Amino acid sequence: MTQDELKKAVGWAALDYVKPGTIVGVGTGSTAAHFIDALGSIKHQIEGAVSSSDASTAKLKSYGIPVFDCNDVDVLDIYVDGADEINGQMQMIKGGGAALTREKIIAAIARKFICIADESKQVGVLGKFPLPVEVIPMARSYVARELIKLGGLPEYRQNVLTDNGNVILDVHNLSILDAIALENQINGIAGVVTVGLFANRGADVALIGTANGVKVIG
């Protein structure tokens, strides 16, 4: 199976966790896009969705799925999203698609976070994939200097603005042994909106696409 076929398999497998009549939290990226395709097939069974990006909102609306403002929803039954990396503790690096802040907000109000990914995203130690950090534009240089002090090599993601109007620094050269501590440390830097470490709030279930089918963890 190709990588895209593995992503499609886990996107459709996530339908098993969607309860009729609920509002579903939906992530961003190529794997989440397959979940939206799957969700379109049962759109009349759900109340709607909360979306983590303008791109996902547009795709949901193209299927006629109502999209709710996060402020109008107290709690979500599930949140389904991909990951750039996921370790054995169900901690993730996310934000390759620059939607990390909204993804983290939706994860916070969801009872269950379901990570959908192909097997290439499974790692022993987080950090080979550059760690995205969303930053207020005026703080970009300061935050970069602080990230260097932590041992990282930050790279400004050129020509990218988040849906919130901020910039992204991708931090290379990190071997993340204590993801919770690093998440808290980077989030404490003035000017950081959030870091793409999902460790304090990791995944509850991981659906991993493999050549032998979908592996369920959690």
Curated annotation (Swiss-Prot):
Assigned keywords, A-Z: Isomerase
GO molecular function list: ribose-5-phosphate isomerase activity
Residues the entry annotates as binding substrate: T28, G29, S30, T31, D81, G82, A83, D84, K94, G95, G96, G97, K121
Pathway annotation: Carbohydrate degradation; pentose phosphate pathway; D-ribose 5-phosphate from D-ribulose 5-phosphate (non-oxidative stage): step 1/1
Highest taxon listed in the record's lineage: Bacteria
Pfam families (UniProt xref): Rib_5-P_isom_A
GO BP, one annotated term: pentose-phosphate shunt, non-oxidative branch
Name of the protein in its database record: Ribose-5-phosphate isomerase A 1
Gene: rpiA1
